[in-house]
C-alpha cells in the first residue's frame, strides 16, 4: 500500500517540510495519506465559513476524509497573530498548530485527553 504526504504552499511563508513529515508519521503513522495546504487569509476564511459556519479566517483547519486520509490547511498570517498571544515564536507556533491538527485527524476533540496527547508530541518534538 503506497501512502502520500502532499505539501502545497500557496503563500510566500516558509514552512518546515521535514518536521511536518516526521510529526505526521509519529502521530498518524506511515500509512496515513495527508495533504497539507498553506493558504492565504481569504481562502481560509472561505473554508471556515463553508465548513464551520464562521465568517472569519482561522489559523488551522483539519478535515478527516477517512480513517487513513485527511487534509490540513494552515494560514500563516493568522498563525503569526496567534503566536504572539501564546508567547511563542512563529516557527514554533506553526509546529504547535500542526500537532494540534494531526491530533484532530486522529479523532480527538478539544478537551483534557486531546491536550495530554498534544503535550506528549510537543515534548517529543521540542515544541
Show where each model-derived region lies.
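Histidine-centered acyl-transfer/condensation active-site motif
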Residues: 98
